[in-house]
Design a protein with these regions (language model features):
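Short, acidic Ser/Thr/Gly-rich low-complexity loop/linker segments typical of extracellular
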Residues: 47-84
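Conserved beta-propeller blade signature
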Residues: 251-254, 316-319, 358-361, 437-440, ...
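Structural motif
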Residues: 25-37, 56
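A short, solvent-exposed loop/turn motif at the edges and junctions
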Residues: 91-105
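Short loop/turn segments that connect beta-strands within beta-propeller blades
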Residues: 266-270, 331-335, 373-377, 452-456, ...
């Protein structure tokens, strides 16, 4: 073997290898022979799993498929990592900031040999290693309000710092792109729409010429050596695996928002079954917003399945279809869908179920909270307050606007939008505290609200930070709220109406966009989506200690968090579009923070 004493790198030695399956212990050494910790070691199949894709590129309804897991571990302080048994041929990728990615092919994995990770010295390549938040931290220096508005309105479908977005474009190209995104639903102010194209053209041209301006991302913690990440590829580049739930039956149910398909996944074996959500008579492609996705190359969105919740009474799953005025109910035992027509309201969004088996959900575009009483088979809607008469009028005209959008009229490009999105207050996340009260976050008004189901009384609370998106309650009845454009979460104590700010543990400071979060009540831990940082963040509530966990794929845009009974963390890569994800493959992600303990 060639010896390059002046090459900063890592020597990877294969210690053991079983026959017919890859069960290996790796040791990572530096050029001085000392152990090298915190190398991300990812094992992936040489070839993707062969599945039946005869239903327009997807598995036929009800037909069992067998996926193949990808496994990632991190080397410990001794430079070691263990890859558990797995049949078949695999490749291994070595990744560490500051080094070139290195792939080890199956033929080399069968030999007791050595590999070297070369140090990366090219400034452009070093910048390209860094996650989206490092790139977006360079945007709009000195224009904090504009930067937050841009990230809030242009960073909720996909990352703005991925390789697809940070490339050089002309102002004309940016103008065209922004107009299309506004048709998709972005509420970027009219002033920002006019100002940003030239600013973005100049900025990304400057960064392309000076990649050294892109700062380093969040340092990797020694805690990673205990962690593992398992990914199961599902769907394709045209899917959007938006939300999911860990069901009491042990399965994970994932909704493909763009293809109206529900995935039933066995997280232990990788076997899964797809159930196509059937459109109802009279449903149009695109639902009530038929013209919204006219430019998208492939979708089967009649309903737009969005958020999921399980009934503790019978295990049925309730799904919000954002492009219709209904709730969908799925019976995991009979594998059948039933529909409940709301009859009013627009854009059913996030859903939760209370202890009385009432289904609560936000109606994002009609400024309402909805409730479905399963026992009485009755819907009730609760109107949230408006900020002005003009906003009330705009919301009341929503049915008319929907018709225009359905006809393909670009009405969203014609109306004037102010900096606070008057007309679209957007009630978004929802949860229920242990005392039975319903809480929502209203994204564009910087407020949360409580609803007392016993009286119907609604109380609004202004948040000290901008853009509350999703919220969850902990075991003490406190609320945790992701503040999307602020790289922070708020804790709200209902008893005292006190807010406390917790900044996310990212570098550069203030650069992440927490789309959602969830509380592991048993372990008293908060887990937050690092939507812009290719990671997930854990806060130990008792100690206040944060830990950042990087994920294996670049452009991993996550929108939800769930937990397995043994404390593993579930996520899904849910970028819209999914072709922004590294290798254009969405996955169901299972993070075990204590795999080696």
């Amino acid at each position: 073997m060639n010896q390059h004493t002046n090459l900063l790198g890592a020597l990877i030695a294969l210690a053991t290898l079983s026959t017919g399956a890859l069960a290996a212990d790796f040791q990572v050494q530096g050029p001085d022979g000392k152990p090298l910790p915190l190398v991300m070691v990812t094992r992936a199949p040489s070839q993707p799993a062969v599945t039946d894709t005869s239903d327009n590129g997807y598995a036929p309804t009800g037909k069992l498929q067998q996926g193949t897991f990808e496994f990632t571990g991190f080397t410990d302080l001794g430079g070691r990592v263990h890859l558990p048994d797995a049949p078949g041929d695999y490749r291994v990728r070595l990744r560490k900031p500051g080094f070139k990615d290195h792939w080890i092919e199956p033929a080399l994995l069968a030999k007791a040999t050595s590999w070297r990770m070369e140090a990366e010295t090219d400034l452009k390549a070093l910048a390209e290693q860094r996650p989206s938040n490092a790139w977006t931290s360079t945007l709009l220096a000195g224009r904090d309000d504009l930067r937050k508005e841009f990230m809030a309105q242009c960073g909720f479908c996909h990352q703005q710092g991925s390789s697809f977005l940070r490339r050089e474009r002309s102002a004309e190209d940016w103008d065209s792109t922004i107009k299309r995104m506004v048709r998709y639903g972005a509420r970027l102010s009219t002033e920002a729409q006019k100002e940003l194209p030239a600013l973005l053209e100049a900025h990304w041209k400057d960064i392309a010429a000076h990649p050294e301006k892109v700062p380093a991302g969040t340092p990797w913690s020694p805690a990673l050596s205990a962690a593992s990440v398992t990914e199961l590829p599902i769907g394709d580049r045209f899917s959007q695996m938006h939300d999911f739930i860990q069901h009491s039956n042990g399965m994970v149910y994932v909704g493909d928002n763009l293809q109206d398909r529900l995935y039933e996944v066995n997280p232990q074996t990788g076997a899964y079954t797809v159930y196509r959500v059937p459109p109802q008579p009279g449903d149009n492609l695109g639902g009530l917003l038929a013209g919204r996705l006219k430019d998208f190359p492939k979708h089967e969105t009649y309903q737009g399945i969005h958020s999921l919740a399980e009934s503790a009474k019978d295990g049925h799953i309730f799904i919000t279809p954002s492009y219709q005025r209904r709730l969908i109910e799925f019976d995991p035992k009979t594998k059948t869908f039933s529909n409940h027509e709301i009859g009013s309201g627009f854009y059913p969004h996030t859903v939760r179920i209370d202890d009385k088996d009432r289904v609560w959900f936000t109606l994002a575009l009609s400024n309402q909270i909805g409730m479905y009483d399963r026992t009485a088979n009755k819907f009730t809607t609760y109107d949230l307050p408006f900020r002005s008469f003009m906003e009330k009028l705009t919301v009341k005209l929503t049915p008319f606007f929907f018709k225009l959008i359905g006809w393909g009229v670009p009405v969203t490009n014609w109306v004037k939008i102010d900096h606070v999105s008057t007309g679209v207050p957007l009630p978004y996340g929802i949860d229920i505290t242990p005392d039975g009260k319903v809480w929502i976050a209203r994204l564009h008004t910087d407020e949360i609200a409580s609803l007392d189901p016993a009286t119907g009384e609604i109380t609004m609370f202004a948040t000290p930070l901008k853009n509350p998106r999703r919220l969850r309650t902990d075991r003490d009845g406190n609320l945790w709220i992701g503040m999307f454009s602020e790289s922070a979460v708020l804790r709200f104590e209902p008893k005292t109406a006190k807010f406390t700010t917790f900044h996310l543990p990212v570098q550069p400071v203030g650069s992440d966009t927490p789309y959602a979060l969830n509380v592991d009540r048993k372990r008293h831990q908060l887990w937050v989506n690092g939507t812009n940082s290719d990671g997930v963040h854990r806060l130990d509530i008792a100690t206040g200690q944060w830990t950042h966990f990087p994920l294996p794929r670049k452009a991993t845009f996550t929108r939800d968090v769930e937990f397995t009974p043994d404390g593993q963390v579930l996520l899904s890569s849910a970028s819209f579009p999914s072709w922004h994800i590294e290798d254009a493959q969405p996955t169901l992600i299972r993070l075990n923070p204590n795999a080696r303990k």
